[in-house]
Amino acid sequence: MAAGSTGERPFFEIITSIRYWVIHAVTLPSIFLAGFLFVNTGLAYDAFGTPRPDAYFQATDTKAPVVSQRYEGKAQLDVRLK
């Protein structure tokens, strides 16, 4: 070991190893697929409480809602959406 070395493998050695790619060939695509399904199934909207794209405006609306009171904005929008 060289002086000052922590004993860890160099990054280049890790990413050029077969073991790294065997593990990551499965995990990286599965993380991407999980995120894709999380968003496309609408679970992300439910988990974070955001309105779905079709719920921003009512069918009768012709323009975006305007909030007139800074601290009562959510209450104004909730009344409007009922």
From Swiss-Prot:
This b-type cytochrome is tightly associated with the reaction center of photosystem II (PSII). PSII is a light-driven water:plastoquinone oxidoreductase that uses light energy to abstract electrons from H(2)O, generating O(2) and a proton gradient subsequently used for ATP formation. It consists of a core antenna complex that captures photons, and an electron transfer chain that converts photonic excitation into a charge separation. Its cofactor is heme b. It comes from the Bacteria. The keyword S-adenosyl-L-methionine does not apply. InterPro entries: PSII_cyt_b559_asu (IPR006217), PSII_cyt_b559_asu_sf (IPR037025), PSII_cyt_b559_N (IPR013081), PSII_cytb559_asu_lum (IPR013082). Belongs to the PsbE/PsbF family. The chain crosses the membrane at residues 22-36. GO terms for biological process: photosynthetic electron transport chain. This is Cytochrome b559 subunit alpha. PANTHER family: CYTOCHROME B559 SUBUNIT BETA-RELATED. Heme binds at H24. Signal peptide: none annotated. It holds the Pfam family Cytochrom_B559. It is found in: Cellular thylakoid membrane. One of its GO terms (cellular component) is photosystem II. Keywords: Electron transport, Heme, Iron, Membrane, Metal-binding, Photosynthesis, Photosystem II, Thylakoid, Transmembrane, Transmembrane helix, Transport. With its partner (PsbF) binds heme. PSII binds additional chlorophylls, carotenoids and specific lipids. Heterodimer of an alpha subunit and a beta subunit. PSII is composed of 1 copy each of membrane proteins PsbA, PsbB, PsbC, PsbD, PsbE, PsbF, PsbH, PsbI, PsbJ, PsbK, PsbL, PsbM, PsbT, PsbX, PsbY, PsbZ, Psb30/Ycf12, peripheral proteins PsbO, CyanoQ (PsbQ), PsbU, PsbV and a large number of cofactors. It forms dimeric complexes.
